[in-house]
């Protein structure tokens, strides 16, 4: 109740015009709110607002303090770094304060920072690095041996997490070599990689335990475990980003920040491979855009990039203000999480009959776009979140990922909030819905009787990766079904140009072009045909593996589950889906109707070992290929027996690097994976 009253009071004050009379109570309310959110974020590991909303409140307080300096409070969050040491850990006073960074939110902000710096010290270069979304850590080495580790805490006093830090495998217990100082403090970020975060939450989900909202909370919670065995099980990582205290001070250190990071690396400390020195302002902005573009593909969460004056002498000249260095700034990305209101829930039916709840949201700008809908996945997810209509929810949108609700803000729940009821009947056709034992998804039982499944199945059949009917977009498919011109995939091949002129905004010329595209699509490949059928969990790669293994549709139709499991990358679940599909009479009728309509493909000869020289190898494609379509390259590699993966790992045999290859290339080089260019790939394909 106190939280609700605090938010209500703050909202009332923020809605008023600021005057000398009400400025002080507004600033006090902002301080109180921000300090409360600091405790939730740093102490409880349970934030109730997003980073972007916190930033907005902080910016508002800074503006007011600049305008009314006489009202600046001693407990204002602008007067300290932020965060508190937990009493349950031994408290450690830092040998040198661990300060935070000022923020830039756009090019104008950074340009102003650049001008302030260059006005003081002249021409500058910047060492640029990703701003990891984890927990700042100080690690003290004495005579090369890890002696102590602490959190940043409030910047002056932190928490002793030595035993927990020792469990992070990427942190050396003893420095490499012998050219390090007698005493050296290493500062960096402890974080949880995305893959480790997903695995941690999956384990929690199976045990019906509370899930972490994001990797940052998971990392913070893991480092604050009293039992270091729990920390050890959490697969944390660490990147060093600066030197702290060094004794003796006479020890020779590198003269630039970038070179000091390389020194740290030479001592055995992990340093990000994404660090780059930029000499021009335009290079800084290009670096920012490059990292922003690749943000979703990076193996760790970041919320911006950090720009530091590279020359150490210039850093010393610039010095510090009360809570941050003058020589560094965090250039923040657009927020990936925002808070908004859940106004209602709709239920959509997909091509496989899956009934998916979709949240209707009060529109909010997040991840670079305005979001008004978000997936709720299934009934289990609704129950896990405890979400109700009317709740204030936290929305996350990362890269091209569909926006989703990751948490609710329980203290903002209104009294008239309504529970979300899953329908008992299909919202499209009225058929009963069913949920099979062991499955999370609820499905409509109507099959092709259900218009939604019919529409989505035919859209999928005509899509680019399936039969690739040029010009057959979603809206045209919907019209064809609405006007009862098409009831099944085979009906597409009965369409004539004159029939399609019945569609909205479809003249004879466009109809003729579409009719020709339909005719051309009759000649396809067996992998595309199998993918087009929409068999559950059979994507492009699985369809290609099935076609390669069995060689013909006839052989696949009669394959047993035991035979299907022999196919590369097919387990028992997918094998059951495939066998079940071909056991259904109505599916066989659809296939026969398509073949009768003239759909055909060249015969695939069962490959010999000589024809699959890449069998057992894992390949990855990255960058832009100029002479070969990415999907064609993937298909040809698969035909040679290769598995084509989406990410580089120690199990990768070869990376094909096209133009503008980014993090995958760097990862491959780091792991010693073989790298070839497009010309070498073309030569390989030509000779195989």
From Swiss-Prot:
UniProt keyword terms in alphabetical order: DNA damage, DNA repair, DNA replication, Ligase, Magnesium, Manganese, Metal-binding, NAD, Zinc
Binding sites annotated in the UniProt record for Zn(2+): 426, 429, 444, 450
GO biological process, alphabetically ordered: DNA repair; DNA replication
Tagged with keyword Metal-binding: yes
Catalytic activity, EC: 6.5.1.2
Entry superkingdom: Bacteria
Keyword NAD in record: yes
Entry-linked SMART domains: BRCT, HhH1, LIGANc
Residues annotated as binding NAD(+): 51-55, 100-101, 129, 152, 189, 308, 332
Names of the cofactor(s): Mg(2+); Mn(2+)
Single GO term (MF): DNA binding
Record-stated family: Belongs to the NAD-dependent DNA ligase family. LigA subfamily.
HAMAP family cross-referenced by the UniProt entry: DNA_ligase_A (MF_01588)
Function: DNA ligase that catalyzes the formation of phosphodiester linkages between 5'-phosphoryl and 3'-hydroxyl groups in double-stranded DNA using NAD as a coenzyme and as the energy source for the reaction. It is essential for DNA replication and repair of damaged DNA.
Name of this chain's protein: DNA ligase
Lineage of producing organism: Bacteria, Pseudomonadati, Pseudomonadota, Gammaproteobacteria, Alteromonadales
Gene this protein is translated from: ligA
